[in-house]
Amino acid sequence: DLTENRLSNSLLQAGLNDSTSSAINIFSADVKTALAPAIVDVSRNDTSELNTFDFKMTNPEVFNMPAGPVGMLVGFEYRSESYSDDRDPRLDGTIQFQSAVTGLGFPFVGDVLGSSPTVDTSAKRSTNSVFAEMVMPLTNKMEAQFAMRHEDPDDTKSSTVWKAALGWEIANDVLLRGSKSTSFRVPNLIQANQLYVTRSGNVDDAVGEFVGANDPLDDRYQIQSYRIGNPELLPEESDNTSWGFVWTPSNIEGLTVTWDDWRIEKDNTIVLFGRTNAMVADLVARINYGPDNCGGYNNPAIIRDQNPGYTSAEIAKFAAAGICPAGEAFTIYDEYTNAATRSIAGQDIGIYYDISTEVGDFNITVNHSETTEFEQKPTNAYQALVDAQASGVIPFDITFAGFGNLAGLDGNYVEKTSVKFNYRVGDLGVQLSSLRKGEFYHSSETRSDGTRYVIPSMTTVNASVYYWFDIGDQKARVKFAVKNLEDERAPLADRFYGFFADAHQDYGRNFYLDIKVKF
């Protein structure tokens, strides 16, 4: 992967400080020519490899039960996976840049303007696994399935998971179904093996908010997050439960209705504490420390400007707030870790109706999902923030997120409904669809009294018409589609583009014409 026309920080800094005629002239009308001495190409060589070997034996009739034969499968699998990420010398620290303004250099600042420094990484993992599956007819109307799998990676603890499922046709048009299972996910090779990676992003500085908005410390600016890999990470493990029914009424041909209730309990969720939470933790620590003996305060998780150049009046504002003065933060150290239990539960409803008539074929699909619970039990560090806010140490407009009740928080809408309609007669077809995403609240806009800023639901409608025809011996299709038919705009949010991009899109009404030929 090669990216051209990037700017080197070290070459740019040297060119701007050059006192000769070769200096970079930022006032030149020909910007590209002026910056040419600092323009570089940036490369990245990423390689991943997966080798597998498996052996399976099956028997459709291991033994017989009154309702029929029992089928079984057993097997063994070996997997070897490797990953190598070779970054450009200007990103991996081979060629380093040190800022003449902040004094920061690698690994906090890379030599490519606008790109975070990233060290080279390589890792590999081998896994042995054995598994077995069984299908057992209990009665003519009831069937059970059982499965078990044991995985033994060479770089983390082994795990054994299982699944049991039951289907019971209690009537000719009603099927009850349920399952209970466990699952696991090992840390990916990057989380477990990368020494560190630096990423930049905007952050709300809780200290600046607490002392006074942008006076004397900015309350929002860009910061580096120094994410540290952790070879001691444990696999994520979960217990999954689901039950529901399928109804296919015999008196309404083509109609199927499904309903399922599900729950997932996951332990050892791999998380980062997060730069916003780290800022709030620094504020709580400063409040607890007090305004005296400020030279003795130290927070190893955050590197701040030690010489912010505050005036006596500005220092007095920190003292009035009861904390020691703090400069802007440059970097936050954040290590991958295993968190406590995460609980997710919800319900899904599906309606599917297919009908053929003399005027064409109709297909209608309605899906609705609702999340009834989404909670991440807090780590000790996060619980300290919750307790500080509950006791009044910090106000409610100092926000933090990622733990606790996550339902309806920052893009985690709890309701989603989709409707699809298809009609086809001969070679002509029409499609209509709609998608509704429910409301959620924007945590960073919470008021000091705890009032939440709610981002309303958003519904978009798409429509298309297509026609199949022949081009010689080949089948071809022409399709005209309108996306976001009603020109719905994304709800307003305090984000970079004015809307919550993690949940919404703001393309407005748009069209496209698609021509496809099958060879």
Language-model segment annotations:
Residues 61, 78-84, 148-154, 180-186, ...:
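Transmembrane beta-strands of outer-membrane beta-barrel pores
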Residues 1, 27-29, 52, 56, ...:
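Surface-exposed extracellular loop regions of Gram-negative outer-membrane beta-barrel proteins
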Residues 267, 372-375, 433-445, 467-519:
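C-terminal beta-signal and adjacent terminal beta-strands/loops
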Residues 70-74, 144-146, 162, 176-178, ...:
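Transmembrane beta-strands of outer-membrane beta-barrel proteins
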Residues 49-55, 128-134, 160-166, 229, ...:
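Hydrophobic, lipid-facing positions within transmembrane beta-strands of outer-membrane proteins
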Residues 1-127, 155, 181-232, 260-345, ...:
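Surface-exposed, low-complexity loop segments enriched in small/polar and acidic residues
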Residues 199, 364-470, 486:
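C-terminal beta-barrel architecture of Gram-negative outer-membrane proteins
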